[in-house]
Amino acid sequence: MAGKRKTIEEIASEYLEGDNLRNFVDFYDFMKNNGLTVTKPSKILRGGWKIAYEGKKIGGFKIWEKNFWFCGVEIYKNLTDAETYEKYITAEQKQFLLDNFRTTPPCCKGKDNFEFFGKTYNTVCTCWPHFQGNPEGEALENAKQLILVNKKVVADIAAAN
């Protein structure tokens, strides 16, 4: 019989320490306090979890290895539509996204011809743009605010339908 699956809190305590653990706990508490759900999407995404609102994926995070984690926001067409998305995002948040937008090596079969704020990218990671490892300070706050932007966009799209 398989053992009990570890909770996110148990995994974080096992893998992270010091400021990295404190920052992750802060981020995880932020998600819980903002009505977001966190689920393990598949066995393929080792160490990764999906952040969702109203059943729509709006971000994710990974506890990747010993004392290393990262988070990101979901980028897909209905969240980046300029008329919808940009009315919620500040110029600084937009720049933060652009500065942290990552493409993937061609071997990962990322998405080609992906338009993001007027620029076309090739080999875009089909997961989500992730921010530097072990986010803290301004980077962590930007990640939180962008997740809230995605939550608001999802709510507005649902309200319009």
Where do the model's predicted regions map?
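Short, conserved beta-strand/beta-arch hydrophobic-aromatic motifs that form part
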Residues: 42-161
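Short N-terminal edge-element motif at the start of the domain
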Residues: 13-38
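A short, surface-exposed helix-loop junction/capping segment
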Residues: 1-17
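Polar low-complexity intrinsically disordered regions
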Residues: 1, 33, 159-161
